[in-house]
């Protein structure tokens, strides 16, 4: 967990970076941006079988209350400005998970004139979750990968 040592008196020593990153990884608040069938799997991951609450993940309805955006589904050109606007409303630090083949690169509709070929053209993406649609386990693995990425960042040195 980033704890460097425990002394005999019950005192824990750590660095500020590790403490901040530990708190951030244990309290990710994602905002759902469900656009298609991948959103059903995202809701499935939030249900009791997978219990994302045990990881400190609580879905928030507002971008101002969340620090993770999960883009799930086909992003069309008409929806791209709304995605960027919602992303800009999120407080720093913020992360994005791209869920499913359509969000990753256009998916089945890649050659359509109205489809954005990957949400990374609109917002910076931290973790890609493959699949059509990806399972709830795949999303859970992607969230764990995001937690590992957050643990490796230097928060004070930014």
From Swiss-Prot:
<dbReference type="GO" id="GO:0005506">
    <property type="term" value="F:iron ion binding"/>
</dbReference>
<feature type="binding site">
    <location>
        <position position="37"/>
    </location>
    <ligand>
        <name>[4Fe-4S] cluster</name>
    </ligand>
</feature>
<keyword id="KW-0004">4Fe-4S</keyword>
<dbReference type="GO" id="GO:0005886">
    <property type="term" value="C:plasma membrane"/>
</dbReference>
<keyword id="KW-1278">Translocase</keyword>
<dbReference type="GO" id="GO:0045271">
    <property type="term" value="C:respiratory chain complex I"/>
</dbReference>
<dbReference type="GO" id="GO:0048038">
    <property type="term" value="F:quinone binding"/>
</dbReference>
<dbReference type="InterPro" id="IPR006137">
    <property type="entry name" value="NADH_UbQ_OxRdtase-like_20kDa"/>
</dbReference>
<feature type="binding site">
    <location>
        <position position="102"/>
    </location>
    <ligand>
        <name>[4Fe-4S] cluster</name>
    </ligand>
</feature>
<dbReference type="GO" id="GO:0051539">
    <property type="term" value="F:4 iron, 4 sulfur cluster binding"/>
</dbReference>
<keyword id="KW-0830">Ubiquinone</keyword>
<dbReference type="GO" id="GO:0050136">
    <property type="term" value="F:NADH:ubiquinone reductase (non-electrogenic) activity"/>
</dbReference>
<keyword id="KW-0411">Iron-sulfur</keyword>
<comment type="similarity">
    <text>Belongs to the complex I 20 kDa subunit family.</text>
</comment>
<keyword id="KW-0520">NAD</keyword>
<keyword id="KW-1003">Cell membrane</keyword>
<keyword id="KW-0997">Cell inner membrane</keyword>
<dbReference type="GO" id="GO:0009060">
    <property type="term" value="P:aerobic respiration"/>
</dbReference>
<dbReference type="InterPro" id="IPR006138">
    <property type="entry name" value="NADH_UQ_OxRdtase_20Kd_su"/>
</dbReference>
<comment type="subunit">
    <text>NDH-1 is composed of 14 different subunits. Subunits NuoB, C, D, E, F, and G constitute the peripheral sector of the complex.</text>
</comment>
<keyword id="KW-0813">Transport</keyword>
<comment type="function">
    <text>NDH-1 shuttles electrons from NADH, via FMN and iron-sulfur (Fe-S) centers, to quinones in the respiratory chain. Couples the redox reaction to proton translocation (for every two electrons transferred, four hydrogen ions are translocated across the cytoplasmic membrane), and thus conserves the redox energy in a proton gradient.</text>
</comment>
<keyword id="KW-0479">Metal-binding</keyword>
<feature type="binding site">
    <location>
        <position position="132"/>
    </location>
    <ligand>
        <name>[4Fe-4S] cluster</name>
    </ligand>
</feature>
<protein>
    <recommendedName>
        <fullName>NADH-quinone oxidoreductase subunit B</fullName>
        <ecNumber>7.1.1.-</ecNumber>
    </recommendedName>
</protein>
<dbReference type="GO" id="GO:0015990">
    <property type="term" value="P:electron transport coupled proton transport"/>
</dbReference>
<keyword id="KW-0472">Membrane</keyword>
<dbReference type="Pfam" id="PF01058">
    <property type="entry name" value="Oxidored_q6"/>
</dbReference>
<keyword id="KW-0408">Iron</keyword>
<keyword id="KW-0874">Quinone</keyword>
<feature type="binding site">
    <location>
        <position position="38"/>
    </location>
    <ligand>
        <name>[4Fe-4S] cluster</name>
    </ligand>
</feature>
<dbReference type="GO" id="GO:0008137">
    <property type="term" value="F:NADH dehydrogenase (ubiquinone) activity"/>
</dbReference>
């Amino acid at each position: 967990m980033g704890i460097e040592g425990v002394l005999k008196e019950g005192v824990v020593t750590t660095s500020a970076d590790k403490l901040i990153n530990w708190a951030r990884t244990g309290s990710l608040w994602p905002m759902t941006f469900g656009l298609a069938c991948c959103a059903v799997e995202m809701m499935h991951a939030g249900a009791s079988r997978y219990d994302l609450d045990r990881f400190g993940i609580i879905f928030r309805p507002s971008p101002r209350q969340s620090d993770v955006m999960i883009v799930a589904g086909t992003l069309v050109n008409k929806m791209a400005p709304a995605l960027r606007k919602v992303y800009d409303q999120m407080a720093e630090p913020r992360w994005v998970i791209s869920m499913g083949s359509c969000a990753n690169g256009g998916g089945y509709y890649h050659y359509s004139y109205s489809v954005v070929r990957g949400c990374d053209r609109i917002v910076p993406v931290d973790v890609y979750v493959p699949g059509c649609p990806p399972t709830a386990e795949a999303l859970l693995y992607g969230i764990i990968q995001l937690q590992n990425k957050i643990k490796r960042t230097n928060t004070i040195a930014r």
